[in-house]
């Protein structure tokens, strides 16, 4: 995938990003042979899906970003490749958390913090400016399990499908941006 062709990425260090993406793909291939971390077939499409939100939302003021159910790193890892924010990834699966820790070391990402626990069990020391999650669970239960990380200024950015409209019943302050079948939902 040629990232320089996308206007919304022009203000980022794409050479560094592409180097880290290469390391990510190699590491994922190694881990996947043994641990079967993900069934995704087109990694490039999923990387693009992870960073496309930068076309819709300005992350520049976010100091702490929490990602819930990080799995193989989509979307948080790729945002961490581009942004200076501190990323706090919550992934209770030991194999996936080990992959993320290895990736942090291999890509030299001091802004990436991995927690091998469920977010609702975390004894927080920070409040997140942004909480992200990609297709983990319905909106309302997600809001509930994240209550220890949020305050009145926290923004949720969710990667969802077309079902998002039903999930937002009785929720008032949100925006949805569409890209193909993806719905990027921003809850304020």
UniProtKB/Swiss-Prot annotation:
Pfam families: GidB (PF02527). Signal peptide: none annotated. It is found in: Cytoplasm. Keywords: Cytoplasm, Methyltransferase, rRNA processing, S-adenosyl-L-methionine, Transferase. InterPro entries: rRNA_ssu_MeTfrase_G, SAM-dependent_MTases_sf. GO terms for cellular component: cytosol. The keyword Cytoplasm applies. Specifically methylates the N7 position of guanine in position 527 of 16S rRNA. This is Ribosomal RNA small subunit methyltransferase G. It comes from Campylobacter jejuni subsp. jejuni serotype O:23/36 (strain 81-176). The lineage of its organism: Bacteria, Pseudomonadati, Campylobacterota, Epsilonproteobacteria, Campylobacterales.
């Amino acid at each position: 995938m040629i990232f320089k062709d996308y206007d919304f990425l022009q203000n980022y260090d794409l050479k560094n990003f592409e180097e880290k993406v290469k390391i990510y793909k190699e590491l994922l291939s190694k881990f996947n042979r043994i641990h079967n971390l993900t069934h995704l077939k087109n990694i490039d499409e999923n990387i693009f899906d992870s960073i496309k939100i930068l076309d819709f939302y300005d992350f520049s003021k976010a100091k702490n970003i929490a990602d819930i159910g990080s799995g193989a790193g989509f979307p948080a890892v790729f945002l961490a490749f581009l942004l200076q924010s501190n990323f706090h990834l919550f992934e209770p699966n030991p194999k996936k958390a080990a992959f993320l820790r290895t990736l942090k070391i291999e890509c030299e990402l001091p802004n990436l913090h991995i927690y091998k626990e469920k977010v609702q069990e975390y004894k927080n020391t920070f409040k997140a400016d942004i909480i992200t999650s990609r297709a983990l669970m319905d909106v309302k239960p997600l809001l509930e399990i994240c209550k220890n990380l949020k305050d009145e200024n926290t923004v949720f950015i969710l990667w969802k499908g077309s079902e998002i409209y039903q999930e937002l019943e009785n929720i008032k302050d949100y925006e949805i941006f569409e890209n193909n079948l993806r719905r990027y939902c921003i809850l304020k």
